[in-house]
């Protein structure tokens, strides 16, 4: 098809005019670094705001209801002074595209029927709607006519839009009403520090609230500003609360500056997760006589209270920092600080929350309770991994004013729920600037590369390498978190195959040792003076990051139910001797007439994460063991220990991963790994690997252990060779009693399944819950 030259010229000129106005996100965290050029590779009619034809009814559209993210919700239309809904009859993805563009998103990802975001109120304005997808407004699509419908609100339609915004999109507020929602992108609002005390602090906790309009940042008049507005703004920027400030200093500053005010005011209830959910307040009309928009007022100021870990002066020195009380809720399985599966403490035991009716408001209550801001996303469908144990809460419905999730309206019955429906959150956290102090170079994609850090040397900021000596997966996890790239999938001690920045080839950090919870690499322990004998160009630390990770969890109940003793002849233990599965005294045992006493049990290891568990080494590096005639893909997959009650090791064992495979899987999940015929090894997410009690090395040699009370402990993936989303649940403990002839195992539980107080009771409780007799 030929394109008229004039049309092309007009489009090109329009593009040249528009490009300079684009601004990158004020929000620092990936993935908000939007790549604007890809927007313009799409057909122009898809992404530009159009003038509505004069013969088309003027409407406004918003996304409402029980939203889990800002870019989704029930479709509501403002027509003839009243908000109403749209019926799902004949609705299509083409209509969803029109809706999403009308509220400022590039396109629709999907649409939902049957009031999945809750039933609306008021009239059902549109039914049997048909769009081609090219319309500039929903009002231009064909339908039964305004208000002509046979639908009820349980048929209200919803949409899920792409997270990508239309560059330069402006909210159309030509319809004057006082219940209109704002439509402000998170990158279009900021807290600008004004007083010198706040200008160079991270995070920014106090300053003017400014909205970007076109190319200019504008202040908001404080005439109609309320503490509820401040509460919402602080929550957006990662702060759990707000406080009062000194208005005198700001009044003096305002009197000396020429200010440009936004023409609208805000009217938040204080329960909103995001400023875009607030209503517009009265318009700020300019006084034509005094030429003033905010007469007798000044710019709105917010002063936010950070939690202790984000306080500008450090956790211990910021006395006024927000301090959460004894936690009754926690997050597990998230890659970033402030995200994870929601778990609640009840009767001393941690349990999960079912995602029925889970939305942004309830998620925000959890986030604030933990010292973060409001929720960016209410995560459903166990997308942050499956929990273990009970499901404590269901159908949580918070109003947004609660101090804790346990204060919300909820159902304590969990019928119909399982761990595939575990709820999670992604919370707003303050911008700390950590992301700008580390980078990856030389990798094949943005998720991998040699680690380069920015540090101060001789009064200047310089980039340099990190020594790869003793660099491991825990340190790599911190780097990936700092960059907002998810979990670490690999840690490299050699990066000679990656060409880093030639101006950053000097080692400036060595001896890095992290616990795994740090916000940045600089918070990890490291050498004061750099010591890296092998150098950093070839042996610089590197990482590969991934958005998902596996999560191995041992079934404690299986261990408790299958434990028993066996006196096994040495003649049957020669292979076990070769693989060091017996205690040291076994070398002195008569190989023909002697025997060893073995504590045997079965292990059922589940992968509850979001990706497959694969050995660190490829099959080319697996080790062949001729005696057992099999390959070991991981020389140490688990540790088995028998400890005294004070924690001293009295007997030990270990299990090499001679065969990591899918024994069984949940539901319709297909097995992917099988050891037969030198097959690939691993554990698929949603599957488990069963190590039966009757296979070699599935034991602890307790021949030399005297009778008494002990702690039995199993540690999976003990050397952190393979990354996981949660290492805290890799430990399982049991109380055990051995009388010289029989063994009892009781109170078996996975690490972190109970409160610390309950854990201590388990370790000192003398009661017996089962009686496993020895088999001799």
Swiss-Prot record:
Keywords assigned by UniProt, alphabetized: Basement membrane, Calcium, Chromatin regulator, Chromosome, Copper, Disulfide bond, Endoplasmic reticulum, Extracellular matrix, Glycoprotein, LTQ, Metal-binding, Nucleus, Oxidoreductase, Repeat, Repressor, Secreted, Signal, TPQ, Transcription, Transcription regulation
Signal sequence, renumbered to the chain: 1-25
Enzyme class of the recorded protein, top EC level: oxidoreductase
Subcellular location: Secreted, Extracellular space, Extracellular matrix, Basement membrane; Nucleus; Chromosome; Endoplasmic reticulum
Domain called SRCR: residue spans: 61-162, 191-305, 329-428, 438-546
Catalytic activity: L-lysyl-[protein] + O2 + H2O = (S)-2-amino-6-oxohexanoyl-[protein] + H2O2 + NH4(+)
Keyword Endoplasmic reticulum: yes
Listed GO CC annotations: basement membrane; chromatin; collagen-containing extracellular matrix; endoplasmic reticulum; extracellular space; membrane; nucleus
Transmembrane spans: none
Cofactors (names): Cu cation; lysine tyrosylquinone residue
Glycosylation sites: 267, 291, 458, 646
Domain notes: The fourth SRCR domain plays an important role in optimizing the catalytic activity of the lysyl-oxidase like (LOX) catalytic domain.
Function: Mediates the post-translational oxidative deamination of lysine residues on target proteins leading to the formation of deaminated lysine (allysine). Acts as a transcription corepressor and specifically mediates deamination of trimethylated 'Lys-4' of histone H3 (H3K4me3), a specific tag for epigenetic transcriptional activation. Shows no activity against histone H3 when it is trimethylated on 'Lys-9' (H3K9me3) or 'Lys-27' (H3K27me3) or when 'Lys-4' is monomethylated (H3K4me1) or dimethylated (H3K4me2).
Family membership: Belongs to the lysyl oxidase family.
Subunit-structure text: Component of some chromatin repressor complex. Interacts with SNAI1. Interacts with TAF10. Interacts with HSPA5. Interacts with EFEMP2.
PANTHER family cross-referenced by the UniProt entry: LYSYL OXIDASE HOMOLOG 2 (PTHR45817:SF1), LYSYL OXIDASE-LIKE-RELATED (PTHR45817)
Record protein name field: Lysyl oxidase homolog 2
Species assigned in the record: Rattus norvegicus
């Amino acid at each position: 098809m030929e394109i008229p030259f004039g049309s092309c010229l007009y489009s090109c000129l329009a593009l040249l005019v528009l490009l300079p106005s684009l601004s990158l996100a004020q929000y620092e965290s990936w993935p908000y670094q939007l790549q604007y050029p890809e927007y313009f590779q799409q057909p122009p009619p898809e992404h530009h705001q159009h003038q509505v034809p004069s013969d088309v009814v003027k409407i406004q559209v918003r996304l409402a209801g029980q939203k889990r993210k800002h870019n989704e919700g029930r479709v509501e239309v403002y027509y003839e002074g009243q908000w109403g809904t749209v019926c799902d009859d004949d609705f299509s993805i083409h209509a969803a595209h029109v809706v999403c563009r009308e509220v400022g998103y590039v396109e629709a990802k999907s649409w939902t029927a049957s009031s999945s975001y809750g039933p609306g109120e008021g009239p059902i304005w549109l039914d049997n709607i048909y769009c081609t997808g090219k319309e500039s407004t929903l009002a231009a699509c064909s339908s039964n006519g305004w208000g002509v419908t046979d639908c009820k609100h349980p048929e209200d339609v919803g949409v899920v839009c792409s997270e990508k915004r239309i560059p330069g999109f402006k909210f159309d507020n030509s319809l004057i009403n006082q219940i209109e929602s704002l439509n402000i992108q998170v990158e279009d609002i900021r807290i600008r520090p004004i007083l010198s005390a706040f200008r160079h602090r991270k995070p920014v906790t106090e300053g003017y609230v400014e909205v970007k309009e076109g190319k200019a940042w504008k202040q908001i008049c404080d005439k109609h500003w309320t503490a509820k507005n401040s509460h919402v703004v602080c929550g957006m920027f990662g702060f759990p609360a707000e406080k009062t400030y000194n208005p005198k200093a700001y009044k003096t500053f305002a009197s000396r500056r020429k200010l440009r005010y936004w023409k609208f005011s805000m009217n938040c209830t204080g329960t909103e997760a995001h400023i875009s959910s607030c209503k517009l307040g009265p318009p700020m009309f300019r006084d034509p006589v005094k030429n003033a928009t905010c007469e007798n007022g000044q710019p709105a100021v917010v002063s936010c209270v950070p939690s202790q870990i984000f306080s500008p002066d450090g956790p211990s020195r910021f006395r006024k920092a927000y301090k959460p009380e004894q936690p009754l809720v926690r997050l597990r399985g998230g890659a970033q600080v402030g995200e994870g599966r929601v778990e609640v403490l009840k009767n001393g035991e941690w349990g999960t929350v079912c995602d029925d009716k889970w939305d942004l408001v309830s998620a925000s209550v959890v986030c604030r309770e933990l010292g973060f801001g409001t929720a960016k996303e209410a995560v459903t469908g166990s997308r942050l991994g499956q929990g273990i144990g009970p499901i404590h809460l269901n159908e949580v419905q918070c109003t947004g004013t609660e101090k804790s999730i346990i204060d919300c309206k909820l159902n304590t019955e969990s019928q119909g729920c399982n761990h595939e429906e575990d709820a999670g959150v992604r919370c707003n956290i303050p911008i700390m600037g950590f992301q700008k102090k580390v980078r990856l170079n030389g990798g094949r994609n943005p998720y991998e590369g040699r680690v380069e850090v920015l540090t101060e040397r001789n009064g200047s900021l310089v980039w340099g390498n990190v020594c790869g000596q003793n660099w491991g997966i825990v340190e790599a996890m911190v780097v990936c978190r700092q960059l907002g790239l998810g979990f670490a999938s690999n840690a490299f001690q050699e990066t000679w195959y990656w060409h880093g920045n030639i101006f950053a080839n000097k080692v400036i950090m060595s001896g890095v040792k992290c616990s795994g919870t740090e916000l940045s690499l600089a918070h990890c322990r490291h050498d004061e003076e750099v010591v890296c004998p092998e150098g950093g160009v070839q042996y610089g630390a590197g990482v590969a990051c991934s958005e998902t990770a596996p999560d191995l969890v041992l079934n404690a109940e299986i261990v408790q139910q299958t434990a028993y003793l066996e006196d096994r002849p040495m003649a049957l233990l020669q292979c076990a001797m070769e693989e060091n599965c017996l205690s040291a005294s076994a070398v002195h045992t008569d190989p023909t007439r002697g025997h060893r006493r073995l504590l045997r049990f079965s292990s059922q290891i589940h992968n509850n994460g979001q990706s497959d568990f694969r050995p660190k080494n490829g099959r080319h590096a697996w080790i062949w063991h001729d005696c057992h005639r099999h390959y070991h893909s991981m020389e140490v997959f688990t540790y088995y220990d028998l400890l005294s009650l004070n924690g001293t090791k009295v007997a030990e064992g270990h299990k090499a991963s001679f065969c990591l495979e899918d024994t069984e899987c949940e539901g319709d999940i297909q097995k992917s790994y099988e050891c037969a015929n030198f097959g690939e090894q691993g554990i698929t997410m949603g599957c488990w690997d069963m190590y039966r009690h009757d296979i070699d090395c599935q034991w602890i040699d307790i021949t030399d252990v005297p009778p008494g009370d002990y702690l039995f402990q199993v540690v999976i993936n003990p050397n952190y060779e393979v990354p996981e989303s949660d290492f805290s649940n890799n430990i399982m403990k049991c109380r055990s009693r051995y009388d010289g002839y029989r063994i009892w195992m009781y109170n078996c539980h996975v690490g972190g399944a109970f409160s610390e107080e309950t854990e201590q009771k388990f370790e000192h409780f003398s009661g017996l819950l089962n009686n496993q007799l020895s088999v001799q």
